[in-house]
Amino acid sequence: MSVPDRKRALEAAIAYIEKQFGAGSIMSLGKHSSAHEISTIKTGALSLDLALGIGGVPKGRIVEIFGPESSGKTTLATHIVANAQKMGGVAAYIDAEHALDPNYAALIGANINDLMISQPDCGEDALSIAELLARSGAVDVIVIDSVAALVPKSELEGEIGDVHVGLQARMMSQALRKLTATLARTNTCAIFINQIREKIGVSFGNPETTTGGRALKFYSSIRIDIRRIGSIKGGENFDIGNRIKVKVAKNKLAPPFRTAEFDILFNEGISSAGCIIDLAVEKNIIDKKGSWFNYQDRKLGQGREAVREELKRNKELFHELERRIYESVQASQAPAAACVDSESREVAEAAK
């Protein structure tokens, strides 16, 4: 078949498909603007935004946040909710654990008067509510807290001690098949918080696994593994927060397996000033000599906590350092992009 004949045959097939399934059911990828325009919601931790590679969590996709107890999963999800609201968006929180603290959510920055919350009785109801909210097209981010608390209806109606093999995994698999397409169509971000369990009888390799079967791992565009790695001491040697390490275990939108560290303070959530200090020192924007931190010809303070308080007071300095960090990251990425472009040109010339 000649090239003109192939082109006419393709046009006829496209015309028939659009007649059968509606306009826009098939198109070239370049004309599909949503394919290369990914809108994001900031996480509240600049180090994590940079590790994700796209500046935050993507809208229109599924994100899984998993880790052990008291590692900051709910705090991270609540920061994403607060940032979505600050952008003028609408957020919903499906609290299957019945454990969301409205005072802590407000302290982090969430507008609890506008935050929609649902506390369903069973897993099927929770996932149906999430799907209906996404289908409305009016919600920007939906948090499901947590997968482990999504109890199937038949298990809820049974007796304690009854065995239900694979029931929750089947429920999740069926729900995610419907939810994925709806989220992409309405540009809604769904965040699933998950717990970890130990696999029995594992002698080699990682014995940890997440609840809810394999479907969520497959359908998630991003999986964030969050862990507490230490405590932050304040005055009189009291704990005032936790040091958190995050690993991007899966990423369909940027290179995976990047790591980030940040502070979660008990009285304010994720410390954005702490992220700025860490990144500015790493990029040699702030000069650290002993316990003193200096920026250009100015002494910021002695000790990390003093500098943190200075950045919280001086918003102009905070935003200046943030801008310089972004500029440093973009400058470091430019040579790699130029190298890829030159390799692409060489391949194209060789193909000719």
Curated annotation (Swiss-Prot):
Q: What gene name is given for the protein in this entry?
A: recA
UniProt entry keywords in alphabetical sequence: ATP-binding, Cytoplasm, DNA damage, DNA recombination, DNA repair, DNA-binding, Nucleotide-binding, SOS response
Domain of life, per lineage: Bacteria
Annotated GO biological processes are: DNA recombination; DNA repair; SOS response
Write down the CDD domains for this protein, in alphabetical order: RecA
Outline what the protein does.
Answer: Can catalyze the hydrolysis of ATP in the presence of single-stranded DNA, the ATP-dependent uptake of single-stranded DNA by duplex DNA, and the ATP-dependent hybridization of homologous single-stranded DNAs. It interacts with LexA causing its activation and leading to its autocatalytic cleavage.
Q: GO CC terms on record?
A: cytosol
- Extract the coiled-coil ranges from the record: none
Binding-site list for ATP: G67, P68, E69, S70, S71, G72, K73, T74
Q: Which residues form the signal peptide?
A: none
Q: Which family does it belong to?
A: Belongs to the RecA family.
**Does the record's keyword annotation contain Amino-acid biosynthesis?**
no
Protein name in UniProt: Protein RecA
Indicate where this protein resides in the cell: Cytoplasm
Q: Name one GO molecular function term.
A: damaged DNA binding
